[in-house]
Amino acid sequence: MIIVMSSAATEEQIESVIKRIEEKGLEANVSRGIERTVIGAIGDERNLDQELLESLPGVEQALHIVKPYKIVAREWHKEDTVIDIKGNLIGGNQIQIISGPCSVETPEQMEKAAKAVKAAGVRLMRGGAFKPRTSPYTFQGKGVEGLEMFRAAADKEGLPIVTELMDARQLDTFMKYKVDVIQIGTRSMQNFELLKEVGKVDVPVILKRGMSATITEWLMAAEYIAAGGNHNIIFCERGIRTFETYYRNVLDVTAIPVLKKETHLPVIVDPSHAGGKAWMVAALSRAAVAAGADGLLVEMHPNPNEAWSDADQAINPQELIKLMSELRGIAKVIGREIL
């Protein structure tokens, strides 16, 4: 069972609910979000009186949720959650595109990329300062130096930044450089200690699907973040590993409506990692938006032929402009918009 406290609930009222739960022999898991506090009652729920709990001061509602994920479940939060990133909304009627290079390379490259992102009408910029790579011999990212370059280039164009966190020890550095959105990559989706730490900060999180993760495993990973108090979670489908070897991954478009049914949180898609080739990006992007995705994470490099990593899947600035035009047309047809 979860008990949702009202936004005006006092600390005394929250403690009163916790006491009631513990008196019945259950454990109380308290998740303190920005808007409200959610208390999960863990144990034999038959000992709890739902009506009695709902009558307590400060309680908005109490719900029996059968599924293993509670806070991220749509059962208690029927309306879609809309996440505000410096005035840029993810979720709701607006579709948000996030674009930029795979890796932060040089100040000049990042300045060109930021200008190209802005010129295409994209409102958020992505870029990797710390890079998890399959081979230990490939470029691993610029680290803190890269974060400095990224922040400086994006600030010149007024763009919020999205970058991947690989290690909880880097979190203080991310806070220092005021990273606007933390990305948890596919390899870290079940790094539960990292998820717990990210759950403690007031920064939106993009949670990428593990390359072999089921929908339930993905939702449970998000529950780790939400249980820590951070409810600003964005799911990102980036393709799953199957028997097919012609392309990099298989984009699971079916996951979009399934997640929309199971959770109130926004769902975006990474078409670049799904196909692994630049020529696939536009088609996969169109499919994702048509299927109901709330946004896209698209790799764009000022000069893909010179990219230090993932050159094959990066589109160029002109292709990004064309893609944005196509996506606006699709968004209009399905009653949504890309500003």
Question: Language-model segments: which ranges?
Answer:
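Glycine-rich, proline-tolerant flexible connector loops at the mouths of alpha/beta enzymes
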Residues: 126-144, 301-312
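Conserved, mostly hydrophobic/aromatic
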Residues: 53, 100, 125, 174, ...
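Active-site-adjacent beta->alpha loops and helix N-cap segments on the catalytic face
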Residues: 74-79, 135-149, 168-172, 186-202, ...
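Catalytic alpha/beta core domains of metabolic enzymes, predominantly
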Residues: 85, 201-300
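Catalytic beta/alpha-barrel core
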Residues: 6, 142, 159-169, 180-191, ...
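Alpha-helix-loop-beta-strand connector modules within alpha/beta enzyme cores
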Residues: 139-163, 197-204, 253-267, 313-336
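Active-site mouth loops of central-metabolism enzymes
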Residues: 8, 95-112, 136-141, 160-165, ...
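Non-catalytic terminal accessory/regulatory regions of metabolic enzymes
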Residues: 1-97
